[in-house]
Amino acid sequence: MDTAYPREDTRAPTPSKAGAHTALTLGAPHPPPRDHLIWSVFSTLYLNLCCLGFLALAYSIKARDQKVVGDLEAARRFGSKAKCYNILAAMWTLVPPLLLLGLVVTGALHLARLAKDSAAFFSTKFDDADYD
């Protein structure tokens, strides 16, 4: 008879201490770091000033690679840099057109007021006594 295979033990296991339990306390799981890849792709495709969207895309890809490798701290750092570059890219994309629009509106209002004042000046009738 072959006894190489384990057999079922007919004896019931007896615990060494009655009521002894092992409890593991785990902290709250941290959410995985964000890489902002979609935002970086849109920033890159919009072709903003100084190629900030391209830099954001590079850091987003680095963050995703580090997350896959398991280095969550490096992924968090690269994701933070990608977020900063995305914010800068959005600001460089939105602020200059808004400033230009503000300058055009204030310039148009100033020219309208200037034209109104000059029209009033040229419509004034002078008497002959004013030239003496």
UniProtKB/Swiss-Prot annotation:
Known outcome of mutating S40L: In OI5; correlates with reduced expression and barely detectable secretion of SERPINF1
Tissue spec: Detected in osteoblasts and fibroblasts (at protein level). Detected in bone.
Main location: membrane
Cellular component aspect of the GO annotation: cytosol; intracellular membrane-bounded organelle; plasma membrane
Similarity comment: family membership: Belongs to the CD225/Dispanin family.
Function comment: Required for normal bone mineralization.
Subunit structure: Interacts with FKBP11.
Name of the protein in question: Interferon-induced transmembrane protein 5
Protein species of origin: Homo sapiens
Name of the encoding gene: IFITM5
